[in-house]
Amino acid sequence: MKNVWLAIIALICLPGIGWAQKHKEDKKAKIKAIVEAQNYVFKAQTALPTAGSSRQLTSDYGLQVSKDTVVSDLPYFGRAYTAPLNPSEGPLQFTTTKFQYMVSTNKKGGWNVTITPQDVTDPRELIMTIFDNGSASMVVNSTNRQPISFNGYVTAKK
């Protein structure tokens, strides 16, 4: 009798296991497609300054990536080595149309994306690690400021 109940429970659970695996594969394929097509938005949820504690971001901060433009609207917390020429502009708020975009796969199935703006003096480069489940982390290296990291997720651009 015990074996019959175990068999019934196993038959009920098996379709759910298969669906979960298919859903994971579909999400990975979708993330791969938007990364390779350069058509996505990185939504920052946590800022991790070099010095100090992490900060949860409550506003809609992000980095929009398309084939011809990168638009950054990210906050900065940290130390600046030189004073900005225009203090009303944020250090990570810029739009660039001239940039290098390099993508490579990493060992765990995700992607490493390096964006190097060429028509903006600061930041120097943005290095993003995108995981196959859609979560991502980004490090912003700057000439005149301490590096800062962000954790968040990647989604298709609307």
Where are these predicted regions, by residue range?
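A broadly conserved detector of short glycine/acidic/proline-rich loop/turn motifs that flank catalytic sites
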Residues: 10, 46, 76, 117, ...
